[in-house]
C-alpha cells in the first residue's frame, strides 16, 4: 500500500473508533497536509521529507494509537488494525527519508 491509502485507511479506522479519536484524526490530517507540502513544495523548492515538524505530527499520531484504551468490543477490534496501519505509515515515511539520504552523494 502507499502512504496516501494508509492515511485514508487510518482516518477511516479512527472515525469508526469514535469521538475519542477525533484529536488523533486532526493530527493525522495535519500530518498528511504537512507531508504533502514537504514532498511537493508549492514554491518549487527541493522536497524536505526530513521536516521535524512533520515527523513530530507523525509521532503524536503513533503515540495516541499506542496509548488508546478501548472501551468496548468494537474499539478492541479496531485497536490492532489502527496500530498496524500506523506502523506502516511510519515505515513508509522513513523509507522516503532513507531514499532521500541515499540519493545524497558521499564525500570523496
Regions found by a protein language model. Give the residues of each.
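Structured inter-helical modules in multipass membrane proteins
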Residues: 10-101
Amino acid at each position: 500500500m502507499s502512504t496516501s491509502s494508509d492515511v485514508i485507511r487510518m482516518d477511516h479506522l479512527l472515525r469508526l473508533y469514535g469521538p475519542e479519536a477525533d484529536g488523533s484524526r486532526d493530527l493525522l490530517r495535519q500530518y498528511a497536509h504537512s507531508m504533502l507540502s514537504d514532498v511537493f513544495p508549492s514554491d518549487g523548492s527541493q522536497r524536505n521529507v526530513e521536516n521535524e515538524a512533520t515527523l513530530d505530527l507523525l509521532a503524536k499520531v503513533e503515540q495516541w494509537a499506542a496509548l488508546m484504551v478501548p472501551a468496548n468490543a468494537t474499539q478492541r477490534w479496531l485497536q490492532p488494525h489502527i496500530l498496524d496501519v500506523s506502523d506502516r505509515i511510519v515505515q513508509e515515511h522513513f523509507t522516503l527519508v532513507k531514499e532521500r539520504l541515499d540519493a545524497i552523494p558521499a564525500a570523496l
